[in-house]
Structure formats: structure tokens, C-alpha cells
Amino acid sequence: MTDQVNRPKGVTSVALIAHDNKKADLIAWVEKNSVKLNKCTVYATGTTGKLIAEKTGVDVKRCHSGPLGGDQQIGALISEGKVDLLIFFWDPLEPMPHDPDIKALLRLATLWNVPSACNSATADFLVNSNLFEEFLPQRPDFDSYLSRDVPGN
């Protein structure tokens, strides 16, 4: 099913995203988990990353703001194998103008087998799991998909 990625064990990169009404929750979660996160490359969308860096001291590689393409940039990092874990505190009570981007991001995380959390409880399970230190990404093998016969060609 998958190819194991040849690299050291453990989560080495985390992407952090939060909608406006969830930014305070994510910042609190990052403060609580800063020791582990400081051992990782941390990516974040623009405003979220700025606030995390200012309020927690965690070093963040910032993408654009989510609605300006940041969700898509994180998705690209996922497809390139540069993100091991996605923490995305999204607001289920607010419609977002960039909902298609959000759906695409979550689709890529699922497609590329990237563990994901949408709230602090699930995020806690992921970072406190023994697998956090032992994690080896397993990327799906899409060879059969890429070599399939396409009708009309």
C-alpha cells in the first residue's frame, strides 16, 4: 500500500492552521506543547503563524494567510512530503469564503496519509502518542493510478 519514507523516526514537521475564532485555542495548545513543537519544523498560515511566533516563541515558517492561498501552500507541502502532522482548528460554526481551499487541504492530508487533528483533544492524542517519537510516514503508492488507461487516449 505505501512506501516508507527514508528518514529518521519521529514527527519532524507540523503544520498549524486556525480560523479566527479558534486562534486563541490553537495558541493555548501550542503553549502547552511547545517543547515538542520546538523540535519540529513548524509551518503555519500567515496570521496564525504570526500570532503563534509572537505569543509562544515557537519558530514558525509562515505561508500566506489562509484565504490568500496559505491553505493551498500547506497542501502543496503535504503533497511534497514536507508535513508529517496537520493541526487545523477550524470553526464549524462559521462559513468561510475559502471553503473549497479548506476541503482541498483536508483531502490532500487524507490522500497522503498525514495524521490530522481538528481540535485540541485530537491534537493532544497525536502529540502525546508514543508514535510521535517513532512515527515513520507511509506515503501511498500511486503507481497504478498514474499508469492507468485513460479513456480516449
UniProtKB/Swiss-Prot annotation:
Gene3D superfamilies: Methylglyoxal synthase-like domain. The keyword Lyase applies. SUPFAM superfamilies: Methylglyoxal synthase-like. Residues 3-153 form the MGS-like domain. Its EC number is 4.2.3.3. InterPro entries: Methylgl_synth, Methylglyoxal_synth_AS, MGS-like_dom, MGS-like_dom_sf. GO terms for biological process: methylglyoxal biosynthetic process. Keywords: Lyase. Belongs to the methylglyoxal synthase family. Catalyzes the formation of methylglyoxal from dihydroxyacetone phosphate. This is Methylglyoxal synthase. It comes from Hahella chejuensis (strain KCTC 2396). The gene is mgsA.
